[in-house]
Amino acid sequence: MNVQFPWLTVLTLLPLVAAFFIPVLPDREGKTVRWYALAIALLEFGLSAMVFWRHYDAQSAQFQMVETVPWLPQIGLNWSLAVDGLAVPLILLTGLVNTLAIFAAWQVKQKPRLFYFLMLALYSAQIGVFAAQDLILFFLIWELELVPVYLLISIWGGAQRQYAATKFILYTAVGSLFILIAGLGMAFYGGDFSLNMAALGLKNYPLALELLAYAGFLIAFGVKLPIFPLHTWLPDAHGEASAPVSMVLAGVLLKMGGYGLIRFNLQMLPDAHIYFAPVLIALGVVNIIYGALTAFGQENLKRRLAYSSISHMGFVLLGIGALNGIGLNGAMLQMLSHGLIAAVLFFLAGVTYDRTHTLAMEKMSGIAQSMPKTFALFTASSMASLALPGMSGFVSELTVFLGLTNSDAYSTTFKVGVIFLAAVGVIITPVYLLSMVRRVFTGKQAGDMFDKLLLDINPRETFIALSLLVPIIAVGMYPKVATQTYDVTTTAIARHVHGALPAVAQHHLPLYAQLTQSAPRLFRETTVADNSL
């Protein structure tokens, strides 16, 4: 569906353009600036919801609201934007999390103009990543997003903020180069040079080039997801970032990695994905178990939540590797669910830090007595994270497991092994989450912490937490609230990828027959095809 008015351009540029007016605003201890930033974020979020309600057709798997304007025609670079079922729910998630993160940053005193400028610039970059349809445009916006995050951590972070910010920029910047290298390799192949991402997905590449490009994209997006062993920047970044920045980092930026895997690795390189899908599943299992076990040993509250994020993002890899619509649907739902859950947990971790001035769990022990409402909200959020039935985490993880169970691309033995190992991580999750709640809120009271009265969560903070918990419960009770926005698209992508299975099976029948459940059927199909020639 083409829309005459360039709504996507407006949505992408509005926060950034508005940010440039911040230096001329009257400032009284940052009050004017913070209200201005919140108003822009609310306007952007509301406008996004209105535009997609009116112009987005969830029953179509095609790109919609397409906008293409020549930018640098000499090199084929266009300002090209469009959305589909992958982009729309993630843009809406971006709007909710960023708006609440700006509202959460109400007490920023140090350089408030710069802080809110960077938050709005980061908001624009996230929208641009999900809407970009030109390879170079995607890469430029992806790189632009790194700068605000680096500054937000290095200026407003904790004691080790410079180390954490530098580690973040090194990992992500180096990883991003693989997007450019792999993408340009695809663009220059053949006689028809194109930077349009949809056109790149329609080319027929040699298998070697497709596998190399897939590996490059996997490294780039694996850093952002993150995938073990490319994850080590994340605990440091979360451990030092302020709570609002952690909300955006966990709630949206990690999802950019999952989005990239689906958009580039699945949609553009389906043949290579058949080869790499078992690798993604293995990496997903490692993420789930490693993240859960490592989280259990963390004494820093935010570092424990960071490793929890690594574990939960492993389910995204399982869903992507399942090679069917159910699994891919579950991967998308897990990204949306984790975005909400991680945002509220990191926000509440910030609430406790503002009162106790520590992230060491043994020093916060027993604060439920002074902060009962915070305790209740943190417990509810932890229940969502450990996949309590009735909350979004349960539905998303269950959908991923169903996707694996129903996949005809793997043998029963392989599927049972994967599900068993992933279930180990699921079992460990409530252990480290409930232990965290007990140690922070209900453990033995730390004497120095109770020499002063701790103020409980205030109405503004309660509103922020409930604004994230309500959709978590809504999706858990009625998943169609979320899935209806993307299930047609994920089903179409999964069908497209699954169509590459027979070709891969034909060229690798001995190995394929050992690993996959559908090999006998595909063997008959390929044999009949060969005999008919």
Curated annotation (Swiss-Prot):
It holds the Pfam family Proton_antipo_M. The chain crosses the membrane at residues 5-25, 33-53, 86-106, 114-134, 135-155, 168-188, 208-228, 242-262, 276-296, 310-330, 331-351, 384-404, 416-436, 462-482. It is a multi-pass membrane protein. One of its GO terms (molecular function) is NADH dehydrogenase (ubiquinone) activity. Signal peptide: none annotated. The keyword Disulfide bond does not apply. It is an enzyme of class 7 (translocase). GO terms for biological process: ATP synthesis coupled electron transport; electron transport coupled proton transport. It is found in: Cellular thylakoid membrane. Keywords: Membrane, NAD, NADP, Plastoquinone, Quinone, Thylakoid, Translocase, Transmembrane, Transmembrane helix. It catalyses: a plastoquinone + NADH + (n+1) H(+)(in) = a plastoquinol + NAD(+) + n H(+)(out); a plastoquinone + NADPH + (n+1) H(+)(in) = a plastoquinol + NADP(+) + n H(+)(out). Its main location: membrane. The keyword Lyase does not apply. GO terms for cellular component: plasma membrane-derived thylakoid membrane. Its EC number is 7.1.1.-. NDH-1 shuttles electrons from NAD(P)H, via FMN and iron-sulfur (Fe-S) centers, to quinones in the respiratory chain. The immediate electron acceptor for the enzyme in this species is believed to be plastoquinone. Couples the redox reaction to proton translocation (for every two electrons transferred, four hydrogen ions are translocated across the cytoplasmic membrane), and thus conserves the redox energy in a proton gradient. Belongs to the complex I subunit 4 family. This is NAD(P)H-quinone oxidoreductase chain 4 2.
